[in-house]
């Protein structure tokens, strides 16, 4: 594919994503929903140090020799009140009795209609000889609200809601990782795409993990809100024409308010991250028109993380030949900064293996 045709294809795919985002219902936030929050206090009040317990269901099938497919469930706490907001769910591909193999958690993006990409990654990781799991974020997939599309309602003009549901997502993933560290493997890793990339980076900021890969991550939600929202959404919240909407008289005022409110879910608020930068890889599509590539480059520099740049868009980067293999090899590899750093929980009895 010639360069100009590839660029056109990448931009067309990103335009389709922006069109979908622009079709989401928008409600003006109530006063007081954009109060500033201290990033460190915000996460100190989380469940990261006291993760929810995980229950493991019976084996569903043996798709690959030596691999068991299990459903993971557990309690969840967040701003929503529906059933899907109160319980987490994940699907794991496990190799019983093999603590020596790494465990990789795969996290999907915003509005994911199905887990096809994440399931494909899990199957490929299992075939490589790893444990793997994919998790459904609040309001997505098996946790969606009845009668609405997957992911609708996750991102809101109510900034306190948005930061709280992102924290809930990080807590849910942390619960699965804590279980995996205790029951499954001595090494745990995370891979996320777009919104899932943000979740992966926030996990890296707060927890000492063995390997992290973030593909086209939403590194700076505040900047994306101000500079990347679809035109229809910008008009609905009053951010068109240089205005600041409900957050201020102009864009500069709104930038300060939104930045202070969403600071806890901006990865670069945390320096240095709990996971050393040598274990973190950020995949940067330089043509990204959905979240923008600038914050990815800045974060990689701030954290001294690996930066893999491709002349692709937010969606087309997922189809780059060889990238999937490169990411999977990164996730299962032992990195030079790993020795003695990641906290090791005492191995459990692995009771799931006989359930």
PLM regions: where:
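Cap/lid segment of the alpha/beta-hydrolase catalytic domain
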Residues: 111-115, 119-167
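Serine-hydrolase catalytic core
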Residues: 249-342
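Hydrolase active-site cap/lid region
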Residues: 202-254
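A short loop-to-beta-strand scaffold at the N-terminal edge of the catalytic core in hydrolase folds
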Residues: 82-95
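Gly/Ala-rich beta-loop-alpha elbow adjacent to hydrolase catalytic centers
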Residues: 191-200
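Short beta-strand element of the alpha/beta-hydrolase
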Residues: 100-109
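N-terminal targeting or regulatory segments adjacent to alpha/beta-hydrolase or S9 domains
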Residues: 1-77, 345-355
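Conserved acidic catalytic loop of the alpha/beta-hydrolase fold
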Residues: 170-186
């Amino acid at each position: 594919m010639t360069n100009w045709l590839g660029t056109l294809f990448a931009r067309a795919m990103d335009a389709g994503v922006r069109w979908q985002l622009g079709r989401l219902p928008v409600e003006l936030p109530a006063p007081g929903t954009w109060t500033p929050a201290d990033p460190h206090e915000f996460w100190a009040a989380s469940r990261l140090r006291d993760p929810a317990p995980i229950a493991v269901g019976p084996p569903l099938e043996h798709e690959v020799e030596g691999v068991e497919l299990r459903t993971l469930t557990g309690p969840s706490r967040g701003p929503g009140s529906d059933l899907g907001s109160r319980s987490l769910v994940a699907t794991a591909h496990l190799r019983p009795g093999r603590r020596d193999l790494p465990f990789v958690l795969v996290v999907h993006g915003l509005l994911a209609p199905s887990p096809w990409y994440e399931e494909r990654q899990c199957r490929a990781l299992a075939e490589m000889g790893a444990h793997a799991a994919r998790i459904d974020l609040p309001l997505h997939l098996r946790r969606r609200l009845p009668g609405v599309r997957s992911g609708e309602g996750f991102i809101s003009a109510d900034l306190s809601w948005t930061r709280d549901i992102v924290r809930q997502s990080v807590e849910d993933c942390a619960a699965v990782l804590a279980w995996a560290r205790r029951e499954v493997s001595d090494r745990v890793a995370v891979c996320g795409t777009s919104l899932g990339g943000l979740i992966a980076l926030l996990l890296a900021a707060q927890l000492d993990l063995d390997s992290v890969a973030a593909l086209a991550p939403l590194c700076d939600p505040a900047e994306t809100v101000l500079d990347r929202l679809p035109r229809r959404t910008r008009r609905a919240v009053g951010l068109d024409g240089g205005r600041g909407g409900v957050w201020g008289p102009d864009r500069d005022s709104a930038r300060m308010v939104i930045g202070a409110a969403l600071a806890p879910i901006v990865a670069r608020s945390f320096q240095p991250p709990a996971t050393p930068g040598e274990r973190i890889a950020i995949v940067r599509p330089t043509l990204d028109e959905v979240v923008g590539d600038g914050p990815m480059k800045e974060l990689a520099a701030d954290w001294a993380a690996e930066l893999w740049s491709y002349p692709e868009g937010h969606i087309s980067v997922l189809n780059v030949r060889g990238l999937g293999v490169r990411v999977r090899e990164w996730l299962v590899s032992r990195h030079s900064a790993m020795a003695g750093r990641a906290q090791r929980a005492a191995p459990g009895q692995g009771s799931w293996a006989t359930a």
